[in-house]
Structures are given as C-alpha cells and as structure tokens.
Amino acid sequence: MLACLMLAGGGQAQTAIRVEVSLVNVAFSVRDARGNLVASLTRDDVEVTEDGVPQKITFFGRSADVPLNLGLIMDVSGSQQSFVKPHLKDLEAFLKNVMASEDRAFLICFANRVRLVSDYSGSGKELVAALREAEKGKGNAEYPIVGPPEYRILGTAFYDAIYEPANLMFTGSTRGRRALIVFSDGEDNSSAHHMLEAIEAAQANDVTLFCLRYTEPGRNGRVTARNKYGTSVMARIARETGGLDFDAQAHGLQEGFRQIGAQLRSSYELGYQTSNPSGDKTFHKIAIRTKQPGFEVRAKTGYYSR
C-alpha cells in the first residue's frame, strides 16, 4: 500500500515522501456540537481504530499544509445542463479562494461517457474557461475518454465519473490531499461500474468526495423515486469517503462552495501502520474518535486492502 509521510524541519515547508509500507492514510474533519469546524486539534486529541483494534498514529498534520489535488466532475447530461452555467463566476471565485500556489485541479465532464476536458492546472480561471468551451457542446467528442471506451448512445454514467478519475487521476506520485467535487443529481443509467465500486475506488485512493446536488423535479414539480434514489446515493458516497453532501438547489451553489472551502481548509490527515496483512482483499473498518466529548468526526469508513 502506498503511504504518504510528511517531514518538516524548523520553518521549512513540509515535504511528502511516498514509500511502499503498510501504512493507511486518512483525511478527516471534526465538528463541534453546533456543527462548527474544529481546526485546533493535535495528535494527542484523537484515537484511531481499524476493525476495532487501536492503531498507533505515525503521522498527524493539518491538510492545509500539504498540496491539494482537486477534480471537478461535471454532469452535463440533459437534466443538468442548466445547473452550473449561471454560476461560472462563483466557481472561478471558489477556485481562486481555495487553491494555493502548489495546488492543482482538473476538470471532467460526463453524460454517457466520461471525458477529460482539462488536465491538471494551477489556474482556476483556465479551468472555468475550459468548462465554458465544453458548455458550448461543440467538439466534445475530441476530449479524451477517461477509462476504457464504452459504446453508449444515451444515458448518464455517474458511477463511472467517480470510479475512473479516482483510479486514474491520483497516481502514487501525487503528493498531498485528494478530493473530487461532483456536480450532479446522482442518477445513473449507463455506467460500467456500480455504486459500491465507485466508493471503493475513492476509499482505496484516499479521495474525499464532495457532492453538490441539484435535483430537477418530475412533472408537476413532484420529487420522483429516481430523484430520491439519486439523493441517497450522493449522501452515501460523501458519507463513506468523509466528504460533504450539499443540496445546492435548496441552498445555492455559493453556500455549497463556502462549506466545501471551509472543510478543505480545516481538515486533518493522519497515518498509521495497519496491523492487518496487506493485500488480503477484505474491507477494514476505520473509526476516528476525539477525546473531547460532543465532537463529530467525518472520515472514510474504511478501505479494501488491495
């Protein structure tokens, strides 16, 4: 298993070194009883268990101290085409606010296929410009497909849009935090992979999922069974990867961006050497607790040892 060790010397920036040992990395955030993010914890304030067995923390740090690798995953299927377009300036402002000098992000758009519209860039302005071009609907077939090509005429490949970038866009040499922000209603009808595979891919590659959900009601403004299922899917994906599920239709994209930015700036990362054998192909449950009562920890629920 690849793990990331953070080394720092007095006043110097931290450096990430990836080594082949049985270490597990976990990004997590903590909230108090009022829902406010807690950003002042130390290694001595938290405990971690794997499958109920206490683990020794070998690394603890603030996520803001390491580079951010961010993926923007945009649903451009028929029901979602009007979702992000009016908020491109808000998206650009969010990226400018959340991305520091060493941070970088990529852009993927998906409907029946998953396509890389912009590879990693340190400029939020460039990413939004690429999205504007993709929104025009011209030349989309020229964007490279992420993952194996699938023959699909119509449909929405929501699960593939998480599974493929989680596996392919965050390589072993990628330093720092890993996150995907998914803009969608969570509905899927043409993926080659299923929901559990998408969650497993994110957990295995230390990717946190932030879901900005926009649900277009059915006829007469009623919420359909498909709407409800998509809502539950996005909530589960965010919960099991330690991220955030946000109803952007009800509360607005600006507020969603604010909450995601706050969590990214206030989260932590820890590492421990697992007592379980590497590559046993079983699911190992992770639990992080704070010694202070009344705090809620959001982290991935576990991982499959590969």
Give the residues covered by each predicted segment.
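Bacterial N-terminal signal peptides
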Residues: 1-9
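Scaffold/interface architecture of coatomer-like assemblies
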Residues: 11-306
